[in-house]
């Protein structure tokens, strides 16, 4: 047995519920809570109005995710879907998490780029369609329907990522080098991590079943923590989110530019 599967099996045995993914859901809950409280402490006493908006949004992201992970840890937000002769465990609570948290992440980026409300509404609307169609695919009973909805969801994701990499990136560039550097770093993170989600879906238990539920849950947990807590850490340490009254550490991109 490989080390990851062995660790999951031991965790399931210790927790007494027989679910190999429970250990990773527990760790995910803990990491999301740590991220939430870290952002709260970091933002305590911040007076800049614009910075407070970013903190409020960014704190909500791991906060919502921690509630979703805790519910999955206790077996809530879990259902069984029969696909042919096989019964699949589907964590629909994960999609509920994404339905709330991914628009908030996009809102952070939209505020950073200072785009108009129509652009924000379009971005969030396509994102919501991406999540809902992904959930429909996960709950479908035939392989054809599942893969069709997966493709629909993936196309929506490509539209969102294209919008970030073109229109929003251009708008962020107009706001100066600090904003552009932070936006580009965060967008690169989103592009890499979000692209991994449909790949994991297609090779996981909801798709081809190449990897088991325990490993799938571990990988989703790593992606979620990085996409939420990692995103927030980069954003909230940047000068780009502040007015002239306060200034945390510069972004990594700005530091590199200064060194040159």
From Swiss-Prot:
List the stretches on the Cytoplasmic face of the membrane: 43-51, 114-116, 173-176, 246-260
Q: Name one GO cellular component term.
A: plasma membrane
What GO MF terms are annotated? monoatomic ion channel activity; photoreceptor activity
Membrane topology (UniProt): Multi-pass membrane protein
Similarity comment: Belongs to the archaeal/bacterial/fungal opsin family.
Species: Halorubrum ezzemoulense (Halorubrum chaoviator)
Q: Which domain of life is it from?
A: Archaea
Q: Which residues form the propeptide?
A: 1-6
Q: What protein name does the entry list?
A: Archaerhodopsin-1
User: Which SMART domains has this protein been placed in?
Assistant: Bac_rhodopsin
Q: What is its main location?
A: membrane
- Which function does this protein serve? Light-driven proton pump. It may interact with bacterioruberin in the claret membrane.
One biological process term from GO is: proton transmembrane transport
One family name in Pfam for this protein: Bac_rhodopsin
Transmembrane feature ranges = 21-42, 52-73, 92-113, 117-139, 144-172, 177-204, 213-245
**Which residue positions does N6-(retinylidene)lysine occur at?**
228
Give the matching SUPFAM superfamilies: Family A G protein-coupled receptor-like
Give the InterPro entries listed for this entry. Answer: Arc/bac/fun_rhodopsins, Rhodopsin_retinal_BS
Q: Where in the cell is it found?
A: Cell membrane
> Which of UniProt's keywords are assigned here?
Cell membrane, Chromophore, Hydrogen ion transport, Ion transport, Membrane, Photoreceptor protein, Receptor, Retinal protein, Sensory transduction, Transmembrane, Transmembrane helix, Transport
| Record bears the keyword Membrane | yes
Q: Which residues lie on this side of the membrane: Extracellular?
A: 7-20, 74-91, 140-143, 205-212
């Amino acid at each position: 047995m490989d080390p990851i599967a062995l660790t999951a099996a031991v965790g399931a045995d210790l927790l007494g519920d027989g679910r190999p993914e429970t250990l990773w859901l527990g760790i995910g809950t803990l990491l999301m809570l740590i991220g939430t409280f870290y952002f709260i402490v970091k933002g305590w006493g911040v007076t800049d109005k614009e910075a407070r908006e970013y903190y409020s949004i960014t704190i909500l992201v791991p906060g919502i995710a921690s509630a979703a992970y805790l519910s999955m840890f206790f077996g809530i937000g879990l259902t069984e879907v029969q696909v042919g002769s096989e019964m699949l465990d589907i964590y629909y609570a994960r999609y509920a998490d994404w339905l709330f948290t991914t628009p908030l992440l996009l809102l952070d980026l939209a505020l950073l780029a200072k785009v108009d409300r129509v652009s924000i509404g379009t971005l969030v609307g396509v994102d919501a369609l991406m999540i809902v169609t992904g959930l429909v695919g996960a709950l479908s009973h035939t392989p054809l329907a599942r893969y069709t909805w997966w493709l629909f969801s993936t196309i929506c994701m490509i539209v969102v990522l294209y919008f970030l990499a073109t229109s929003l990136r251009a708008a962020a560039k107009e706001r100066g080098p600090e904003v552009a550097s932070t936006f580009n770093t965060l967008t690169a993170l989103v592009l890499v991590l979000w692209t991994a989600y449909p790949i994991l879906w297609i090779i996981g238990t909801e798709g081809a079943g190449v990897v088991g539920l325990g490993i799938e849950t571990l990988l989703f947990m790593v992606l979620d923590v990085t996409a939420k807590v990692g995103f927030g850490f980069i954003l909230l340490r940047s000068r780009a989110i502040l007015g002239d009254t306060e200034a945390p550490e510069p972004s990594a991109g700005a530091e590199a530019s200064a060194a040159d």
